[in-house]
Amino acid sequence: LADTLHENNADISDIADNAHLNQTILANMYSPLVNLIRQMNVNDAYIILNGPGRENEPAKTARAALYLRTNAPNNYYPKNSDLLLRIGVPAISRKYNLALDSYWQSCFVPSLCADTDFFDQPYNAYLHSQGTANAAPSDWGYWCMGRKLYEHDAANLMTYSVPLYNASGTLWGILGIGFFQQNLESVLPAADLGDGGGAWLL
């Protein structure tokens, strides 16, 4: 982030109202998000900025965001051909040769989402706590269980999101991962618990 801000003669406060800067930041976040998917073996990785994704539209209605998905995290695909762009501008799709998800959106639009807790909870927790850079992002991390990004999504998601902030404590976005609930159920089968009243503790 620091390099992108420096190259664009910008400050972190500019994220709040500069849609063009935000799209530049997101384009540079593509590789880190791909690495997150591969290293964590998850279906989704996303970053949502604390600023607008469209010119002349406030962040509260259309936030700048990049949301990637793979339906098969355990398989290898050359040139990341398994990845879908769920949220992100077309320029990112063209630059990285990404197929668009069936319900693709250019920005994170809360009014179109079935549930926004994966963003709202860590975002508001950090703001309300007047968080400082001395604490770890995980102090405001939030697990969201069995939700869907959009009502028409086929798979229920489990997500984990944390706030992003700089050394002075300025909140500039949310970073998170997601995986299909059915994937977790497949590796933690209920049959393994037997009849003894056991349970899985996550």
Describe each PLM feature range.
Residues 49-109:
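GAF sensory/regulatory domain recognition
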Residues 88-178:
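Extracytoplasmic/periplasmic ligand-binding sensor regions of membrane-associated signaling proteins
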Residues 28-32, 174-202:
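Solvent-exposed, extracytoplasmic
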Residues 3-8, 50-55, 124-131, 165:
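Short regulatory "switch" loops immediately downstream of catalytic or recognition motifs
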Residues 40-44, 167, 171, 196:
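Loop/turn elements at helix/coil->beta-strand transitions in domains of secreted/extracellular proteins
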Residues 4, 32-39, 48, 69, ...:
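Structured segments of extracytoplasmic/periplasmic soluble domains
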